[in-house]
Design a protein with these regions (language model features):
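Intrinsically disordered, low-complexity terminal regions
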Residues: 1-168
Length: 168
């Protein structure tokens, strides 16, 4: 567990197995997490951007804030769920093989992609419908530039269900 810390540059956290919890931590630049088997929970954490890779395990972000509006973030989960609650993410790419993706009162700002092989997407986005352009692509596709905040959800429509709601 990492708690009540300040990291001035990049935080690189790598585990072969086991759960990782990070609480009340400020990371100046990149938050890089890799875990082969185990859950990762980040609560009340801020960073510039993120790179997270989990083979077997779930990712929970609560009060997680990315501050770099220009940098892209990548989240790759092979077998596990992703849950974001009251978080702010910028230009994020989520790639899930097996598992569900959900948010509660979370802002996905900039250009975002959610690619699912098997699982459900349940987005409760911070803001209102007019703040976002949410698109669904069950084949190759892209979003237009009609909104600053774009979310492209892609996957096989026979095995991926998606719902989107908003919280102001």
């Amino acid at each position: 567990m990492l708690s009540d810390s300040i990291v001035s540059g990049t935080a690189s956290l790598e585990l072969d197995y086991g759960d990782l919890t990070v609480k009340q931590t400020e990371i100046g630049n990149l938050c890089k997490v890799k875990n082969n088997a185990g859950d990762v929970r980040l609560t009340d954490v801020s960073c510039g951007s993120s790179e997270m890779e989990l083979d077997y395990g779930s990712l929970k972000l609560q009060k997680f804030t990315e501050t770099d509006q220009a940098q892209s973030s990548a989240f790759t989960i092979f077998d596990g769920d992703v849950h974001c609650e009251t978080s702010t993410l910028w230009n994020s790419s989520f790639d899930l093989e097996f598992g569900d993706f959900s948010t509660i009162d979370t802002a996905l700002y900039g250009k975002n992609t959610i690619a699912m092989d098997y699982g459900d997407v349940q987005l409760n986005l911070h803001g209102k419908n007019s703040d976002y352009n949410v698109g669904y692509s069950y084949a190759a596709g892209s979003l237009n530039d009609s909104s600053r905040n774009q979310i492209l959800i892609s996957g096989d429509k026979t095995v991926v269900d998606a719902t989107v709601t908003f919280t102001e």
